[in-house]
Amino acid sequence: MGPRGRQSPSSPLAPSQGSCFFILFCLRLGASCPQSCQCPDHAGAVAVHCSSRGLQEIPRDIPANTVLLKLDANRISRVPNGAFQHLPQLRELDLSHNAIEAIGPAAFSGLAGGLRLLDLSHNRIRRIPKDALGKLSAKIRLSHNPLHCECALQEALWELKLDPDSVDEIACHTSAQEQFVGKPLIQVLDSGASFCSTHRKTTDVAMLVTMFGWFTMVIAYVVYYVRHNQEDARRHLEYLKSLPSAPVSKEPLSPVP
């Protein structure tokens, strides 16, 4: 018998390696709730409520089993790349009523398949980040943003699944065509207008102006070249006229024998 107090390897009190991994996994799932937020747990699914907390950036200590994340009514100005990549179970993300101006191209990486609703309304977004939103299958709310209506916006909208309940509230805050400013974007597009055709016309005009400029330069060079040659020819002729002529002999020619 071994010394008193030593436990055999088969003792039930000795934790196995597998149980250690299980404990670590559970700790990861049960990560602490972000400071000043509320994280009610419903049957293992966590809803994180961080509304109106004065947050300036997205919290990093969000539980991995979060299914609902409310970050609305804060002061968040940007969404960096990979901000939610550790939240594979996230189904609804509310970022409305913030000051978001910039969204990284990989800001929503890891959410493409599971996310069902993304609320970006009431922010400061001027241009739609096509790379960030184009791969999402979630319904997206973009109303009440100072959008600049242009060809890139029109092309991006074709790839997004916009929320039908708020799509009529997406308006042109600015536009290259003044008649569309302040009008609902869907109404403008349904009328047959196209920001891309305007973009192509602008490009064509710029190309024509450039070609006309080159043509004018070529014509000016040809005119200069001709006039320069004419001036040289005139000077050469005057020089020849100024040369003394050879005296003409007045003696009669002798007959050839």
Curated annotation (Swiss-Prot):
The keyword Chaperone does not apply. Residues 145-198 form the LRRCT domain. Pfam families: LRR_8 (PF13855), LRRNT (PF01462). Residues 33-64 form the LRRNT domain. The chain crosses the membrane at residues 205-225. It is a single-pass membrane protein. The keyword Repeat applies. Residues 1-32 form the signal peptide. Gene3D superfamilies: Ribonuclease Inhibitor (3.80.10.10). GO terms for cellular component: plasma membrane. LRR repeats lie at residues 65-86, 89-110, 114-135. It is found in: Membrane. Its main location: membrane. It comes from the Eukaryota. Keywords: Leucine-rich repeat, Membrane, Repeat, Signal, Transmembrane, Transmembrane helix. Belongs to the LRRC3 family. This is Leucine-rich repeat-containing protein 3. It comes from Rattus norvegicus.
